[in-house]
């Protein structure tokens, strides 16, 4: 009887040991999950977000706005550009050293031809935080005086300050539009005759040459 009780006791002990060993092997996975949700240290965040050259995908049309007759493949390219934060709101991240890089891009002329050619792009190699440039010139105070000339000058200065605040024609495709700085009116760079020469139609909403609707 004592032998039987002793055997049962050791069997239970062995089962408990095996159960514990199984959970011990699974423990590294739990630690790995905790590591994946680890809080990023302040200095790591600071260094990675500070003003520096970083790879950015840039739209080719942004660099070559006048070549609207082409379709580029790929439509964007990876370039090193200055980006990041500065310690003061009065400062901005600007390039202090630049270089050119040449890439092979496919140029496609719809219904005509396509070829792979070389295109040059600007890259930033060094960046610094420098004082922001004042983009709006301070308006000069008009001298008090009589006459139509003084009134015309005052009207002109008021009109200039208003024209600075024109909303852009299109955020994504600025290169396809032309904006009158005085009236803020947007018009297409492409013309109807230019599109028809390529057997296309001018889309006045997007200012692109599209295939004719049937």
Curated annotation (Swiss-Prot):
Distribution of this protein across tissues and organs: Expressed in the pituitary, in brain, in particularly in supraoptic and paraventricular nuclei and the choroid plexus. Also found abundantly in the corpus luteum of the ovary and in kidney glomeruli. Expressed in the ductal epithelial cells of post-pubertal mammary glands. Expressed in the ductal and alveolar epithelial cells throughout the whole period of gestational evolution, lactation and involution.
Pfam short name (any one): VEGF_C
Superkingdom per UniProt: Eukaryota
Residues spanning the signal sequence: 1-26
Sequence ranges of Basic residues compositional bias: 143-159
Gene3D superfamilies for this protein: Cystine-knot cytokines (2.10.90.10), Vascular endothelial growth factor, heparin-binding domain (2.10.160.10)
MF terms (GO), sorted A to Z: chemoattractant activity; cytokine activity; fibronectin binding; growth factor activity; growth factor binding; heparin binding; identical protein binding; platelet-derived growth factor receptor binding
Keyword Metal-binding on entry: no
Keyword set, alphabetical order: Angiogenesis, Developmental protein, Differentiation, Disulfide bond, Glycoprotein, Growth factor, Heparin-binding, Mitogen, Secreted, Signal
Cellular component annotations (GO), alphabetically ordered: adherens junction; basement membrane; cell surface; cytoplasm; extracellular space; membrane; nucleus; secretory granule
TM helices/strands, residue ranges: none
Subcellular location: Secreted
Location (main, coarse): secreted
Keyword match Glycoprotein: yes
InterPro entries membership: Cystine-knot_cytokine, PD_growth_factor_CS, PDGF/VEGF_dom, PDGF/VEGF_growth_factor, VEGF_C, VEGF_C_sf
Alphabetical list of CDD domains matching this protein: PDGF (cd00135)
Disordered: annotated segments: 131-159
Compositional bias of kind Basic and acidic residues: 131-142
SUPFAM superfamilies for the chain: Cystine-knot cytokines, Heparin-binding domain from vascular endothelial growth factor
Gene Ontology terms: biological process: angiogenesis; angiogenesis involved in coronary vascular morphogenesis; apoptotic process; artery morphogenesis; blood vessel development; blood vessel morphogenesis; blood vessel remodeling; bone trabecula formation
Subunit composition and interactions: Homodimer; disulfide-linked. Also found as heterodimer with PGF. Interacts with NRP1. Interacts with isoform 2 of BSG. Interacts with CD82; this interaction inhibits VEGFA-mediated signaling pathway.
PANTHER family: VASCULAR ENDOTHELIAL GROWTH FACTOR, VASCULAR ENDOTHELIAL GROWTH FACTOR A, LONG FORM
Family, similarity comment: Belongs to the PDGF/VEGF growth factor family.
Role: Growth factor active in angiogenesis, vasculogenesis and endothelial cell growth. Induces endothelial cell proliferation, promotes cell migration, inhibits apoptosis and induces permeabilization of blood vessels. Binds to the FLT1/VEGFR1 and KDR/VEGFR2 receptors, heparan sulfate and heparin. May play a role in increasing vascular permeability during lactation, when increased transport of molecules from the blood is required for efficient milk protein synthesis.
Protein name: Vascular endothelial growth factor A
Species whose genome carries this gene: Rattus norvegicus
